[in-house]
């Protein structure tokens, strides 16, 4: 969805599909942001960012949160900082905080990073807004994750069929007696003289009328099949029930030999490991058909031919540079000074 700001700037908002598996969407969302940054050449990480919304019990309880935080400053994964917003209901379904974690705060896991953590009262909309602005300024300046822990409460049950007073009767009696956030904020504005109750009621009535009109229109219109058009980045991706035609993927032998030979050349000032010297010599023999290709050489040629056609090649994870079985050596380390050569 594209949104025009008050200053006339366009902002594209993309919402990821969030599965019922809590927090699984985190690496998906940050991965999409990183892919977008790479495609745009946004090496400064200023043109797009990730906003992740969490629950308090899930943020401290799900391991994928820690894994995502751990990768936030790793060069191959960083997105220049993510804004984490925890909607802290102080309960996880029926589980109280002291039953679901050993730390005082749900945000304790974020202390593994040099990231600020803002605890803010969710019943104070202006304080929440100030926190968000401060968090965005920090992220823009320091390119680090920021966490906002917004304290609130769940007025109703976990879902439509949940009866919260079965397990938290005292808490939910107090919640039932408490004014809504809107009423509490309205009283604050009335004391400041910023608005009259009649004006506030008029705003609320107007918004409610608009919502009811939109709902009525949605219910009255016949169901239609939405037409989905892929953006230009996805135009060449297609699928369907029918098998695709067989595509010729072969490459000329001379071109393969030249690519394999090119992979054995190193800068004049690079000092390879003694065993790498022998490994490179074996590759040269393969290029000259003096030695049979092995699986690792075939893999490197597959990558090389794709790269030659302008296809981006990205390998990530432990040992992806050298290869788990010392077979790939896509990234070499200078034996004397440790400098990298890809």
Locate predicted features:
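Cofactor-binding active-site loop characterized by glycine-rich and histidine/acidic residues
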Residues: 1-114, 118, 328, 332-342
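Generic recognition of flexible, low-complexity loop/linker segments
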Residues: 34-41, 71-73, 106, 134-137, ...
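Short, hydrophobic/amphipathic alpha-helical packing segments
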Residues: 25, 29, 65, 129-133, ...
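Flexible, glycine-rich loop/tail regions that form catalytic "lids" or insertion modules at the edges
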Residues: 144-146, 152-342
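Conserved phosphate-handling catalytic cores of large alpha/beta enzymes
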Residues: 92-103, 111-147, 151-157, 161, ...
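Conserved thiamine diphosphate
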Residues: 6, 105-131, 178-199
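Generic beta-strand/beta-sheet core signal
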Residues: 51-54, 60-62, 85-88, 118-121, ...
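Alpha-helical scaffold elements adjacent to nucleotide-binding pockets in ATP/GTP-utilizing enzyme cores
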Residues: 64-68, 109, 130-135, 206
């Amino acid at each position: 969805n594209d949104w025009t700001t008050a200053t006339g700037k366009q902002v594209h908002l993309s919402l990821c599909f969030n599965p019922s598996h809590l927090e699984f969407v985190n690496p998906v969302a940050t991965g999409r942001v990183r892919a977008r940054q790479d495609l745009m050449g946004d090496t400064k990480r200023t043109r797009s960012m990730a906003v992740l919304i969490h629950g308090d019990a899930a943020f401290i309880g799900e391991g994928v949160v820690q894994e995502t935080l751990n990768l936030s400053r790793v060069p191959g994964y960083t997105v220049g900082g993510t804004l984490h917003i925890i909607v802290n209901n102080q309960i996880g379904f029926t589980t109280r905080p002291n039953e679901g974690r050993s730390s005082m705060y749900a945000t304790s896991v974020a202390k593994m990073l040099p990231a600020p953590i803002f605890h803010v009262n969710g019943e104070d909309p202006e304080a929440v807004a100030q926190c968000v602005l401060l968090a965005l300024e920090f992220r823009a300046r320091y390119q680090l994750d920021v966490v906002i822990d917004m304290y609130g409460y769940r007025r109703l049950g976990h879902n439509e069929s949940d009866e919260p007073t079965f397990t938290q009767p005292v808490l939910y009696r107090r919640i039932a007696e408490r004014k809504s956030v809107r009423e509490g904020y309205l009283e604050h504005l009335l004391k400041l003289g910023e608005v009259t109750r009649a004006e506030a009621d008029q705003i609320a009535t107007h918004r409610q009328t608009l919502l009811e009109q939109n709902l009525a229109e949605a219910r009255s219109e016949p169901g239609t099949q939405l037409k989905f058009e892929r953006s230009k980045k996805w135009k060449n991706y297609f699928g369907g029930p029918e098998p695709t035609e067989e595509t010729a993927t072969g490459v000329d032998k001379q071109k393969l030999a030249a690519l394999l030979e090119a992979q054995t050349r190193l800068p004049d000032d690079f000092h390879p490991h003694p065993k790498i010297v022998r490994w490179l010599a074996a590759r040269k023999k393969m290029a000259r058909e003096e030695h049979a290709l092995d699986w690792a050489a075939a893999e490197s040629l597959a990558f090389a031919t794709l790269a030659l056609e302008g296809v981006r090649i990205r390998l990530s994870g432990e040992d992806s540079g050298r290869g788990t079985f010392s077979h790939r050596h896509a990234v070499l380390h200078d034996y004397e000074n440790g400098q990298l050569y890809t």
